Amino acid sequence: MDIRFNKFNKIIYKLLWVGVRLSKLVSQDLYLKLYQRLLSKFGMKIADRMGYIDPSAFFDNYDYSFITIGSNVTISREVLFLTHDFSISQGLAASGKECGGYFMGKITIEDNCFIGARVTVLPNTHIGKNCIIGAGTVVKGKIEENSIMLGNPARCIGHTDEWGNRHFQMKDYIPIQ
């Protein structure tokens, strides 16, 4: 379902969003359930077994149907998901063209990914399964499965399976019961 966000839809969304945020005060499970329903209602494709999405994450509301999130995905604080980009307008103006424009692109995050705080995910990005995207990273393009990405622009600094095995052997983490 393609819902373009006119002013009325934005007002409705903001009112519903206030309710979702307040639900976090009652229960984390209730918050996640309501948030998933809200995002799905506006066209985002989101797995039934959603992980965690921090309330401060920003999803480009130009067209939610351009965003797909898999199972067990963690989205940390202040992550930006941008599905459109108007930079081409400045490029066209600089080259003497009198027309504007914008780029649109889908964003897909496959299963079992961790997106760190203040990551920016740009249009036309596909993040494969089991990836870790480090805090502050700017991501664009295809990210291979099991990659650990860091920086601006994002670069692969390791692989999640090797990283997980190393920390499992060192036992330097706190296990979740």
Question: What is each residue range found by the language model?
Answer:
Residues 126-142, 146-148:
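C-terminal/domain-terminus segments
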Residues 1-44, 72, 85-90, 152-177:
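Terminal amphipathic alpha-helical/low-complexity segments used for targeting or macromolecular assembly
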